[in-house]
Amino acid sequence: MANFKKVKKGRNLRRKCELCETNIEYVDYKNVEFITKFISGIGQIKPHVSTGTCARHQRKVANAIKRARFMALIPYTKDKIRVLAPAASANTAQAPAEKAKKEAVAA
């Protein structure tokens, strides 16, 4: 009998580096629109797995982002929206079960 190897069918999930395909050698820190593609919503530098860049271009992008931050072209962090809860009073802080017990005792 012949030994047949199982062929795994699947897609090639690996992305090609956008910078390699367009032959970009220098990532300009002044090009804020281009750099913001590599920054998350919080302001962190995205990893190469999510951006699809190769290691060489990931280093160049990271350096460009750091330079742009230092030159105050982009912020270090994004503004977070903070929702403050209203101060709880003594009546609203009690659990409903405790309220029911107090009402039963009072009646």
Swiss-Prot record:
Question: PANTHER family in the record, alphabetically?
Answer: 30S RIBOSOMAL PROTEIN S18, SMALL RIBOSOMAL SUBUNIT PROTEIN BS18M
Which is one Gene Ontology cellular component term of this protein? Answer: cytosolic small ribosomal subunit
Q: Name the gene that codes for it.
A: rpsR
Role according to the record: Binds as a heterodimer with protein bS6 to the central domain of the 16S rRNA, where it helps stabilize the platform of the 30S subunit.
Question: Do you know which InterPro entries this protein is assigned to?
Answer: Ribosomal_bS18, Ribosomal_bS18_sf
Q: Which Gene3D superfamilies match?
A: Ribosomal protein S18
Question: Subunit notes for this chain?
Answer: Part of the 30S ribosomal subunit. Forms a tight heterodimer with protein bS6.
Q: Which GO terms describe its biological process?
A: translation
Q: Does the keyword Metal-binding apply?
A: no
What's this protein's name? Small ribosomal subunit protein bS18
GO molecular function ontology, one term from the record? small ribosomal subunit rRNA binding
Would you identify the family this protein belongs to, as annotated?
Belongs to the bacterial ribosomal protein bS18 family.
Q: Which UniProt keywords apply?
A: Ribonucleoprotein, Ribosomal protein, RNA-binding, rRNA-binding
